[in-house]
Structures are given as structure tokens and as C-alpha cells.
């Protein structure tokens, strides 16, 4: 029970508009705001910003 409360599963969606997503977990205590990470988008074939989707 407690595992999913502290570190929920989130989707990171590409801002390039390709619709590609990464699935990961985040720590709500350390990062209460939405996460943005630069990761590789294989459809766009470049590194782009991925934002947390709620």
C-alpha cells in the first residue's frame, strides 16, 4: 500500500508532439511539482523535453 503512495507511477510525454511517452516513478516528497526531463525521442530522432502527464 505505502509503496504506491510515496513513489507513484507517472507518464512523461514528449513535447515534440510525437505522442511518445516514458513510464517511470517519482518521489512525491522530493519532487511535488511536475517533472521535466530531457530524454531521447526515437520518433523525432533527437533529445527533447518530456513533461509529466497527470
Curated annotation (Swiss-Prot):
Top-level taxon of the source organism: Bacteria
Pfam families given in the database record: Ribosomal_L33
SUPFAM superfamilies noted in UniProt: Zn-binding ribosomal proteins
Sorted UniProt keywords: Ribonucleoprotein, Ribosomal protein
Cellular component aspect of the GO annotation: cytosolic large ribosomal subunit
Molecular function as annotated in GO: structural constituent of ribosome
Entry keyword annotation includes Ribonucleoprotein: yes
UniProt record, GO biological process: translation
NCBIfam families membership: PRK00595.1 (NF001860), rpmG_bact (TIGR01023)
Family the UniProt entry places it in: Belongs to the bacterial ribosomal protein bL33 family.
Name used for this protein in its record: Large ribosomal subunit protein bL33
Native organism: Corynebacterium kroppenstedtii (strain DSM 44385 / JCM 11950 / CIP 105744 / CCUG 35717)
Amino acid at each position: 500500500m505505502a509503496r504506491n503512495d510515496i513513489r507513484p507511477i507517472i507518464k512523461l510525454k514528449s513535447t515534440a508532439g510525437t505522442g511518445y511517452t516514458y513510464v517511470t516513478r517519482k518521489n512525491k516528497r522530493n519532487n511535488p511539482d511536475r517533472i521535466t526531463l530531457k530524454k531521447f525521442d526515437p520518433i523525432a530522432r533527437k533529445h527533447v523535453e518530456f513533461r509529466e502527464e497527470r
